[in-house]
């Protein structure tokens, strides 16, 4: 154990090179391929801190439930008859069978298919099968001893639900930090609130989860990987009612940039070249009156990809999307995507939003398949151990520590600013946070190991 921890610590310490004097910025490709690092990530990142779960609109009515996987653990989110939300481990308190085996539905109680124990949708054990004749001890069901296990931390920010399997984490708003301002920019576009539209797409790619996390903030690849999308849009017959889309050239030919925030969060933004095709454009006067010229301009004329570490992107660009990243193995990742929209928007705006979403984001769209091909190609390429480093230095001569001019104008306070959307500065902050979390995890495991050795000596 001691040797394993020491080896992992060396790997993590050497995973990122930030040499400002010589402008060398790179990460070691083993962070995408090492199974031991992956196990630590699952335990200490995905099961040890805040992780995005769902949006409140996915559990809208009393009795509704929604199931998901948090790290490696099955979770169910319910809304009880008092309209309160609960996040519970989706595992029977008796022998561990999954209680709820559908993705969504509406039930006020759950009966375990294995032995028939029944639980309220707030987690309370209502009855065990044959409880009166089962010769259970007096302590059975005492003070909730056999209720379902609630997540230690479960909280909403502006309708977005987050949970943690560890109680000792910082307050959610402190964890989100500066990104709260960007979430506000998205939510405040909708006077009646946001809703996730019915239907989702899920796909699995053969690559590490960090490939997907990097990609959503990668403005450099757009004009290369997604040239087919840009070319198709430029040739579409709009006079024949073809769907109008945000100009993909905005990622390279317009103003834009990227920010690395505390806690590993990232933002990629651009100035839209043709904002009039976005559904929000029709509401610019209302937004100006309600929020002022500066914030309204950000909402209407800028696109944004917001990564909330470690597992979700909130995208407000070609269309609007929630993209959830779920690691399965060191070289296998599941992604699930939804379109979200303002409640009560017009049929015309809703149809446009969905068509724009289908064009690029959908599994059958013109963006997603291209990205997945590159993910699997990178994962295979990372096995070339004779070339162990990935370069992250694009834009290094113009990166800004802290806030650049745009961030100052927007009221953001990032750790690092890339002043072009193709710059890779935000990855430095992103991977540095990974490194910080993993080193802290090593210290935790070392303390546990030392304590166990001490206890053995005391017993002996």
Descriptions of predicted regions:
Residues 58-181:
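Rieske [2Fe-2S] iron-sulfur-binding domain
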Residues 47-60, 133-137, 303-309:
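Short Pro/Gly-enriched beta-strand edge/turn motifs at strand-loop
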Residues 31, 35-46, 51-70:
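Glycine/alanine-rich phosphate-binding loops at beta-alpha junctions
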């Amino acid at each position: 154990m001691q040797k394993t921890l020491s080896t992992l610590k060396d790997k993590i310490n050497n995973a990122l090179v930030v040499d400002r004097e010589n402008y060398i910025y790179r990460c070691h490709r083993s962070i995408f391929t090492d199974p031991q690092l992956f196990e630590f990530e699952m335990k200490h990142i995905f099961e040890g801190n805040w992780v995005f779960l769902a949006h409140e609109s996915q559990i809208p009515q009393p009795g509704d439930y929604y199931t998901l996987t948090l790290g490696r653990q099955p979770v169910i989110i319910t809304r009880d008859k008092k309209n309160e939300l609960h996040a519970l481990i989706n595992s029977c308190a008796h022998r561990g069978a999954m209680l709820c085996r559908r993705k969504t539905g509406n039930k006020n109680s759950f009966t375990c298919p294995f032995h028939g124990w029944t639980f309220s949708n707030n987690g309370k054990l209502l009855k065990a099968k044959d409880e009166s004749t089962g010769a259970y001890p007096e302590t059975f069901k005492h003070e909730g001893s056999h209720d379902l296990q609630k997540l230690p931390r479960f909280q909403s920010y502006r309708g977005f639900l987050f949970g943690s399997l560890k109680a000792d984490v910082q307050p959610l708003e402190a964890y989100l930090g500066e990104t709260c301002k960007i979430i506000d920019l998205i939510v405040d576009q909708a006077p009646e609130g946001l809703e996730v539209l019915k239907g989702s797409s899920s796909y699995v790619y053969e690559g590490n989860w960090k490939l997907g996390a990097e990609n959503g903030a990668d403005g450099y690849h757009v004009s290369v990987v997604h040239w087919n999308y840009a070319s198709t849009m430029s040739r579409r017959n709009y006079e024949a009612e073809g769907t109008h889309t945000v100009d993909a050239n905005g990622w390279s030919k317009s103003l834009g940039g990227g920010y690395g925030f505390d806690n590993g969060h990232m933002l990629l933004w651009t100035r839209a070249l043709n904002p009039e095709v976005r559904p929000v454009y029709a509401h610019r006067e209302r937004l100006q009156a309600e929020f002022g010229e500066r914030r309204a301009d950000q909402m209407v004329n800028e696109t944004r990809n917001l990564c909330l570490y470690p597992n979700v992107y909130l995208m407000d660009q070609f269309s609007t999307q929630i993209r959830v990243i779920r690691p399965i193995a060191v070289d296998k990742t599941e992604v699930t995507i939804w379109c979200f929209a303002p409640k009560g928007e017009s049929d015309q705006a809703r149809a446009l939003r969905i068509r724009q979403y289908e064009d690029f984001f959908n599994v059958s769209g013109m963006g997603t398949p291209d990205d997945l091909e590159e993910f699997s190609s990178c994962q295979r390429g990372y096995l070339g151990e004779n070339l162990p480093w990935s370069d992250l230095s694009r834009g290094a001569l113009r990166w800004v520590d802290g806030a650049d001019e745009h961030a100052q104008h927007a009221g953001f306070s990032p750790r690092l600013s890339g002043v072009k959307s193709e710059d890779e500065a935000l990855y430095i902050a992103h991977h540095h946070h990974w490194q910080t979390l993993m080193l802290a995890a090593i210290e935790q495991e070392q303390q546990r190991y030392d304590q166990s050795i001490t206890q053995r000596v005391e017993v002996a």
